């Protein structure tokens, strides 16, 4: 892996319905096999379902869910003298957002509702209320970091 140049971030256009960059990133993560229109209908369908169920602003609820799932600290492996330590490190804001999006989508795919729209809306509502698999994943990550706090002086 070359260390000479830093990879430039690609420009992402905001989504057409809400004008939100994060929703576009979320849509791109939901997308499978390049089928953007399918991903768009899933995400917009889930946000419409949230609006119907919660009777509140779906974009605000979406951002609340992302904030509740985003980890603040995680563990990274570090080899020191033949032993591998799990060292707790702070999570950069871009990675925090990417992990939150990934965990929400994986948790939604693991649910047992019939359609992806129902699964995604259910997981987003659960995450906004600090419940669900994605929030549990964040809590497990934080618990791991807390358990390995003794190795925090190995931070790099």
UniProtKB/Swiss-Prot annotation:
This is Small ribosomal subunit protein uS7. GO terms for cellular component: small ribosomal subunit. Transmembrane segments: none annotated. GO terms for biological process: translation. GO terms for molecular function: rRNA binding; structural constituent of ribosome; tRNA binding. CDD domains: uS7_Bacteria. Belongs to the universal ribosomal protein uS7 family. Part of the 30S ribosomal subunit. Contacts proteins S9 and S11. Pfam families: Ribosomal_S7 (PF00177). It comes from Brucella canis (strain ATCC 23365 / NCTC 10854 / RM-666). Gene3D superfamilies: Ribosomal protein S7 domain (1.10.455.10). The gene is rpsG.
């Amino acid at each position: 892996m070359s260390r000479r140049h830093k990879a430039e971030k690609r420009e992402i256009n905001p989504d057409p319905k809400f004008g939100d960059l994060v929703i576009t990133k979320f849509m791109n993560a939901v997308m499978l096999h390049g089928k953007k229109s399918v991903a768009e209908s899933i995400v917009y369908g889930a946000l419409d379902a949230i609006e119907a169920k919660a009777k509140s602003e779906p974009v605000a609820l979406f951002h609340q869910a992302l904030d509740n799932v985003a980890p603040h600290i995680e563990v990274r492996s570090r080899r020191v003298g033949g032993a591998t330590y799990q060292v707790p490190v702070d999570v950069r804001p871009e990675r925090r957002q990417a992990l939150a999006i990934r965990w929400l989508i994986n948790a939604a795919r693991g649910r047992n509702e019939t359609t992806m729209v129902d699964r995604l809306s259910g997981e987003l509502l659960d995450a906004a209320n600090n419940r669900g698999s994605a929030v549990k994943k964040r809590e497990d990550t934080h618990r791991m970091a807390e358990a390995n706090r003794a190795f925090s002086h190995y931070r790099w």
